[in-house]
From Swiss-Prot:
Record NCBIfam families: PRK05729.1, valS
Coiled-coil segments: 887-953
Record remark: domains: ValRS has two distinct active sites: one for aminoacylation and one for editing. The misactivated threonine is translocated from the active site to the editing site.
PROSITE patterns: AA_TRNA_LIGASE_I
Full protein name: Valine--tRNA ligase
'KMSKS' region (motif): residue ranges: 542-546
Function: Catalyzes the attachment of valine to tRNA(Val). As ValRS can inadvertently accommodate and process structurally similar amino acids such as threonine, to avoid such errors, it has a 'posttransfer' editing activity that hydrolyzes mischarged Thr-tRNA(Val) in a tRNA-dependent manner.
EC number: 6.1.1.9
Lineage: Bacteria, Pseudomonadati, Pseudomonadota, Betaproteobacteria, Burkholderiales
Cellular component annotations (GO), alphabetically ordered: cytosol
């Protein structure tokens, strides 16, 4: 073999395009179901089927894939289940927009044809995101990939719905929901974005019914007064206590409504009197229930005023009605004042339209109703059980503080609205008779049988609504494993080991998976929830299209030109006026576009930033640093191969050194340097194992980086060169063996984080290191399924670690002396040394090579060294004195030092004057003052050194 077997430079795309498909083809991700091995499994949070990969996905999947590869290499039965979500609203909107561009609405097509179009779109674009997941190096078991609307998943959804209905835990009722008047559907809280906006606070006079005066009512939404059923004051508000129980006339409507008292009122807000509109406000709805006030709806589903309002406003859009109502109140002298007011406005995240609380007929899951007999937890509600399993420690959150958030959400829970007025999704399995009869069944045939059993023989019409996307997502922990059937996968992989997720969906997804899984299987869905932060830009800003700061992970992997990047960031903006600003910012930030960093560099960056619970401020400069790391690892491997291929690397004898085999005169003569790097590797292996156990990927990445770059490459390779050049055959053999074995171990250690480069290098290193599976030709085996390194405490060698620390200190001291004396790297000079003669003699060949010296001369004592030093700088390291012997022009050196000392003294005077100025210290930012103090300390330190050098110069 020659060194040409490894390409001269690291080309990530070549390796990724080879090994990604190869791993998948070989089926390494399909688990053995070996009862003697531990099980490890993870669910991939299913991304939207027609979506594209974003930085949050890349981060999340780096963590998951790292865990999966680690446990697979530990020999566990390892399953990572991939899948995609049908994403009801998101997908329907995309297809509706395509139709809009053709001048066609979904209603023109009809439901059946429209759903066909969505399926066509899913088939065309659905592989985009799974292709991108593959590009990030993710290694789930693709043979088990699911789509939340495929036949098996749909069967599970219907089964759950029917069983919950039969158990009395699903019901249909009229409740207040978030309503999007453009999409004409209920939406979940997660699809509502509330941001502070500038609005107004109107003070309106409501005349007392007996004509004795009026109450001034404060509101931010005057149009909803048409649906007022009461006005409300705080029961302890002395200003209004005497009016409770009386009535006011509702302006413009001329009906009388009561004055009620409720603790909900904030006495400090406005006038302390507020209107009660149960049909169009969530808080008012609860007030209405407490006081038995019937709600009055005044809006149509598309947010126009309906026939319950006075004729003058019927048919008006809600905001046009607001203006007309305010104008009429003003004309009647009932508008007391209008004041600017900041308020939180809820908008649909898909449409940007103001969301309207709306009373509609919907399907709900009962959150607090006790489950009946025959279930896993009779007498307890699904919420109660979900709280209990976390309190008992069956599920733990990492970091632990998210447990509190989970409790708070569940302790204040409302019944879950699960119906959506869409066409794309799981159609609700309910059929209606002509007189309002409801038959919930697994299919229409069962529904007809139910109807017949109850004596109904008329027509049946299926419910048009579909289920909330989160309903099917909540079943994934068991539906993806084959439920309702009992499968081997259910036995091995439920509960899964860990869920890796962002904090934003703890309630919407995490809590609901706990509810559904405990209710239908009696088990928790996962043992641990690892909650990570969100990926933000380098300044800590949220990444968003409107800010123009989004990054596509695939662009970081493959690179993208500036013009293409600008086009990507400026097309499809909600507000096209932002395009110019975004273009300017992008051209400034990426003048040459984004270079190709490769998947491994991106993954290493993500892992290095994965501190517990904190948001990740993604910085491309870090990515460049980890690409440089990959290059360093590649070049180190080339060096090792060049120095080991074709040589005796010490693998002709058994692994374990027998008596006399490993030492002077033995088959292998390991040096202290060899033993040091092996000892240090045990510590790194232990640190990495702890990092995986604690989900501290930042610690894992840092341990790998520091060991490879700082210890193996910067120190051990340089020491190994000396040993190969100067050593005996036994020493050379031991060094080559150590070079290979440590490198091969490093490749296995780093594989879960940087899978592609480690696989490519392992193919070359493992055969030489005696670690390639027997009987396999190069390329036939894979690093992906090799054993993960485990620390061996017996290989720790503190004496050799101390030896290395002392050697490094001597080398560093020599390098510092070179710097002090302004020696160019090409200039080789002798080192004079005195002190521990035996140690200095042992260090000599290493120090000579690493500090670029012509020789190392060990003198008998310090007196001899001082006599030979001729005033040159002396370094003291432990009990050793070191000096570089450089012939210098004493007069010229004295002049140079004197000039530099004078300059430094001048700088010190300036610094002292600045720091002695009270105004500067008081007004300057602390960082500026600290910087000045640091400069002063550096000047003083250098002055002391130069003074000592000057004093040592001969007269």
């Amino acid at each position: 073999m020659s060194d040409t077997t490894l390409a001269k430079s690291f080309e990530p795309q070549t390796i990724e395009s080879q090994w990604g498909p190869e791993w998948e083809k070989r089926g390494y991700a399909t688990p053995a179901l070996d009862p003697s091995r531990p099980d490890f499994s993870i669910q991939l949070p299913p991304p939207n089927v027609t979506g594209t990969l974003h930085m949050g996905h890349a981060f999340n999947q780096t963590i998951m894939d790292g865990l999966v590869r680690y446990h697979r290499m530990l020999g566990h039965n390892t399953l990572w289940v991939p899948g995609t979500d049908h994403a009801g609203i998101a997908t329907q909107i995309v297809v509706e927009r395509q139709l809009d561009a053709q001048g066609v609405s979904r209603h023109d097509l009809g439901r059946e044809k429209f759903v066909e179009r969505v399926w066509e779109w899913k088939e065309r674009s659905g592989s985009t995101i799974t292709g991108q997941v593959r590009r990030i190096g993710a290694s789930p078991d693709w043979s088990r990939e699911y789509f939340t609307m495929n036949d098996k998943m749909s069967e599970a959804v219907r089964e759950v719905f029917v069983r919950l209905y039969e158990q009395g835990l699903i019901y249909r009722g009229k409740r207040l929901v978030n309503w999007d008047p453009v999409l004409l559907t209920a939406v979940s809280d997660l699809e509502v974005v509330s941001e502070e906006e500038n609005g107004h606070l109107w003070h309106i006079r409501y005349p007392l019914a007996d004509g004795s005066g009026h109450l001034s009512v404060a509101t931010t939404r005057p149009e909803t007064m048409l649906g007022d059923v009461a006005v409300m004051v705080h029961p302890e508000d002395e200003r209004y206590r005497h009016l409770v129980g009386r009535h006011v006339k509702l302006p413009l409507c001329e009906r009388e409504i009561p004055i009620i008292a409720d603790d909900y009122v904030d006495r400090e807000f406005g006038t302390g009197v507020v209107k009660v509109t149960p049909a169009h406000d969530f808080n008012d709805y609860q007030v209405g229930l407490r006081h038995a006030l019937a709600p009055i709806e005044i809006l149509t589903l598309d947010a126009k005023i309906n026939d319950n309002a006075p004729a003058a406003y019927r048919g008006l859009d809600r905001f046009d009605a607001r203006k007309a109502i305010v104008d009429e109140l003003d004309a009647q002298g009932l508008l007391e004042s209008v004041k600017p007011h900041k308020l939180m406005v809820p908008r649909g995240d898909r449409t940007g339209v103001v969301i309207e609380p709306m009373l509609t007929d919907q399907w709900f899951v009962a959150m607090t109703k006790p489950a009946p007999q025959g279930t896993f937890h009779p007498g307890k509600s699904i919420t109660e059980v979900s709280l209990e399993v976390v309190r008992r420690g069956e599920i733990k959150f990492v970091p632990e503080n998210w447990t509190t958030t989970y409790y708070q959400w569940l302790e204040n829970i409302q019944d879950w609205c699960i119906s959506r007025q869409l066409w794309w999704g799981h159609q609700i399995p309910a059929w209606y008779g002509e007189n309002g009869e409801i038959f919930v069944a697994r299919n229409e045939e069962d529904a007809r049988a139910q109807a017949a059993a109850k004596g109904y023989t008329g027509a049946l019409k299926r419910d048009d609504d579909v289920l909330d996307t989160w309903f099917s997502s909540a079943l994934v922990p068991f539906s993806s494993l084959g439920w309702p059937n009992e499968t081997p996968e259910m036995k091995h992989f439920l509960p899964s080991s860990v869920l890796v997720t962002g904090f934003d969906i703890i309630f919407f997804w995490v809590a609901r998976m706990v509810m559904m899984t405990t209710h239908f299987t009696g088990k928790v869905p996962f043992g641990t929830v690892y909650v990570h932060g969100l990926v933000r830009d380098a300044e800590g800003q949220k990444m968003s299209k409107s800010k123009g700061n989004t990054l596509d992970p695939i662009d970081i992997v493959d690179g993208i030109g500036l013009d293409a990047l600008v086009a990507k960031r400026t097309t499809g903006l909600m507000n096209p006026k932002q395009a110019a600003t975004i273009e300017k910012k992008t051209r400034k930030e990426f003048p040459d576009g984004i270079p190709a960093f490769g998947t491994d560099a991106l993954r290493f960056t993500m892992a290095s930033m994965a501190t517990l619970g904190r948001n990740v401020n993604f910085d491309l400069a870090r990515c460049e640093g980890y690409r440089n790391f990959c290059n360093k690892l590649w070049n180190a491997t080339r060096f090792v191969l060049m120095n080991c291929e074709g040589h005796d690397c010490g693998f002709d004898k058994p692994e374990v050194c027998g008596a006399g085999d490993c030492g002077p005169g033995g088959y292998l003569d390991f040096s202290p340097a060899d033993r040091w790097i092996v000892s240090l590797m045990q510590r790194v292996e232990a640190d990495i194992a702890k990092g995986f156990a604690d989900y501290r990927f930042d610690n894992i990445a840092n341990a790998i980086y520091k060991f490879v770059w700082d210890e193996y490459c910067d120190w051990y390779l340089e020491l190994a060169k000396v040993q190969i050049q100067n050593g005996t055959p036994e020493q050379q053999r031991a060094t080559r063996r150590t070079l290979l074995r440590v490198l091969e171990t490093v490749l296995r250690l780093a594989h879960p984080i940087i899978p592609f480069i480690t696989e490519a290098l392992w193919q070359k290193v493992a055969p030489l290191a005696g670690r390639y599976p027997a009987g396999k030709a190069e390329g036939e085996a894979s690093l992906m399924v090799q054993a993960y390194p485990v620390a061996e405490p017996k290989k720790l060698d503190e004496a050799c670690e101390q030896w290395a620390a002392e050697l490094k200190a001597v080398v560093d001291a020599c390098r510092n002396l070179r710097g002090e004396m302004n020696l160019s790297p090409a200039t080789k000079v002798p080192l004079l040394a005195a002190g521990d003669a035996a140690q200095l003699q042992a260090f000599a060949p290493y120090v000579q090579a690493l500090a670029r010296l012509s020789e190392v001369r060990v003198l008998p004592d310090e007196a001899a060294l001082d006599a030979d030093a001729h005033g040159a700088p002396i370094a003291i390291v432990g009990g050793n004195k070191l000096v570089l012997k450089v012939e210098i022009d004493v007069a010229a050196e004295r002049e140079r030092l004197s000039k530099e000392i004078a300059r430094l003294e001048g700088e010190i005077v300036k610094c002292n004057a600045k720091l002695g100025n009270e105004a500067f210290v008081a007004k300057a930012p602390p960082a500026v003052v600290a910087q000045e103090q640091k400069r002063l300390a550096e000047f003083q330190s250098t002055l002391t050194k130069l003074g000592a050098q000057l004093a040592r110069l001969p007269a």
